[in-house]
Amino acid sequence: MPFILSQFIEASRWLGALVVLAVHTSNLFINIADIMSAPHAPLVYVWWFYAAFELGHQAVLAFFVMSGYLVGGAVLAHLRKNQGFLREYLIHRVSRIYLVVGPAVVFTLVLDSIGRWLFASSGVYEWPLFKGHFSALLFLASFLNLQGIGFDYFGTNGPLWSLACEFWYYVTFPLLLLPFARNYPLALRLLGFALGAGLFLAISTPPSWFKFGYILWAGGAFATLIPRPIIRSRWAALLLYAAVVVIIRLVVRGHLVETHPWVADAADLLGSSLFIIVLLAFRYGPSEGFSLLRFKFHKTLADFSFSLYSIHMPILIFARAAVGSTLGNEWATQLATPQNYALAFSLMGVTIVCGYFFSRVTEAKTGAARRKLRAILDRWSPAPARPVPATQAVPAQQPAPAQRQRIEA
């Protein structure tokens, strides 16, 4: 992968996670319901535009596209090269998801339990949004990555729904394409396809975002097969994408979506397609330029963006319950004051720090987890040895007379 594309993806990951965090923080602590009826400072309008559901949703769509491009694209590359890949693919995907999702579900259980005990008077954990979400069944369902698909999410961690969708894309995509993996026995290929089709149908049956999200994820995967950029200029592709996202943010909302629900889906498809065009522009563009993407902090921030996304909501709800119990629920719902903004931004900072330290015991251990999984699989079924390329014998050269004398001496 070109360095500049890799850096763009890293930047998109942490910026997207930051947008989602801002949206949820604003919803809980900053009430700007009078944004259209009263004058505000310019920065308030900037925040209103930035911390909006529509932008957060576009960030999640970009996550799906990038995941498909990286993970699904790798599957397609292996298929085209007739390479065996299922074993390593399983190791990488299971470790990637469960090393974060498993601890995140436990983290949710612990923090929600403490919050329900300490701040019961706030009533936050009794909101209709969380009614019936603290059962053992939903805890188990979240471990199986079924939240948002066949079951509600566990506790207060609603954002985990998207990770459940991604996990099952990881599982079903290579299975559905296994008939094209000619280096595997035909029986295994057909069995894998049948398993993938069965899983896809079973997961698609309950009403969820799984099927529509699959279109976006697979679009990212198959975009890796496009041999040239659709828009050659990276700036032109970026500006077009940004302009459309701005229009979506301002137009695709409220009454329009209620009256014409299909508009939201069309906007999602358009935004995701344009993001793919941006990826291709960076993939096939020149290596120079875009100095802002060359800083190392993009990778540093991206390395814990997954963890931040996975645990931010329980932290924010815990803080909201604490505020409700100490300052009163009316404080968080009043028209925003400087104190509301100060608290919200402080909480965002605390949540980012928590995400970083959480990642140190989860995401940062991915390499070690993969080695352990590989060792376990090797004990059960050793991986076939890679063929050693034949080497042609090279006749030994006779040393020069002077050299021969020194060797023999």
Regions found by a protein language model. Name each.
Residues R13, L61, G68, E166, ...:
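Short, conserved phosphate/pyrophosphate- and ester-handling motifs at nucleotide-, phospho-/glycolipid
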